[in-house]
């Protein structure tokens, strides 16, 4: 009987610990959404709040490629599709509802230039070929753009291998971005930090 009582008390203690842990986890989950890849999800409102504290860097993968789709090409076969252009325009409109003040950059490919142009609907675009080369040097290139932008927010249209590299290098996660997926970073004291994946809405 004594052994049963002790075991019952012990089990109740474990149950209480487990219940407490679940409450903590539930609380954290309610405050922060996470992508299936392990990256925090950052919507437009959260991005705007972050931008009030630090200059933000949003790196988008280009829109749907013409040469890898059966959809109608926008123009050049090395560029994006009509659907990709429409998707970029819709995304840019939603993005600008929360972030109006930013400088726009892209790598020097037709698909990134077209994506950035349709995303911004007329905003001035600066093409930088370094946004095509993604390795350890990408951070220095981004910091250079931040300095040129006088620490304003910047939006960069680049490529899937760049986003994959940054996610792996900064957070150790596997990120396989679809068209127009994006990562959010911020600059602080000359360093770049990966905050998560941008999720419109």
Curated annotation (Swiss-Prot):
GO CC term (a single one): periplasmic space
Role: Catalyzes the dephosphorylation of heptose(II) of the outer membrane lipopolysaccharide core. Required for iron(3+) resistance.
Entry's localization field: Periplasm
Protein's UniProt keywords contain Signal: yes
Stated name of the protein: Lipopolysaccharide core heptose(II)-phosphate phosphatase
NCBIfam families: PRK15416.1 (NF011945)
Record-annotated disulphide pairs: none
Pfam families given in the database record: His_Phos_1
Organism domain of life: Bacteria
């Amino acid at each position: 009987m004594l052994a049963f009582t002790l075991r019952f008390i012990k089990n109740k203690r474990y149950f209480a610990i487990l219940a407490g842990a679940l409450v903590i986890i539930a609380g954290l989950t309610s405050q922060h959404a996470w992508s299936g890849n392990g990256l925090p999800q950052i919507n437009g409102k959260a991005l705007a709040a972050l931008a009030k504290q630090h200059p933000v860097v949003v790196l988008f993968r280009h829109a749907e490629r013409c040469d890898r789709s059966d959809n109608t090409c926008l123009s050049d076969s090395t560029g994006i599709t009509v659907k990709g252009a429409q998707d970029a325009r819709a995304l840019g409109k939603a993005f600008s509802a929360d972030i109006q003040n930013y400088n726009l950059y892209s790598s020097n490919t037709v698909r990134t230039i077209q994506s950035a142009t349709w995303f911004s609907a007329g905003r001035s675009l600066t093409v930088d070929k370094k946004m095509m080369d993604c390795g350890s040097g990408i951070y220095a290139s981004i910091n250079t753009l931040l300095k040129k932008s006088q620490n304003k927010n910047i939006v960069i249209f680049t490529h899937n291998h760049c986003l994959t590299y940054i996610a792996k290098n900064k957070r150790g996660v596997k990120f396989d971005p679809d068209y127009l997926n994006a990562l959010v970073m911020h600059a602080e004291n000359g360093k770049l930090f990966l905050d998560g994946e941008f999720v419109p809405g």
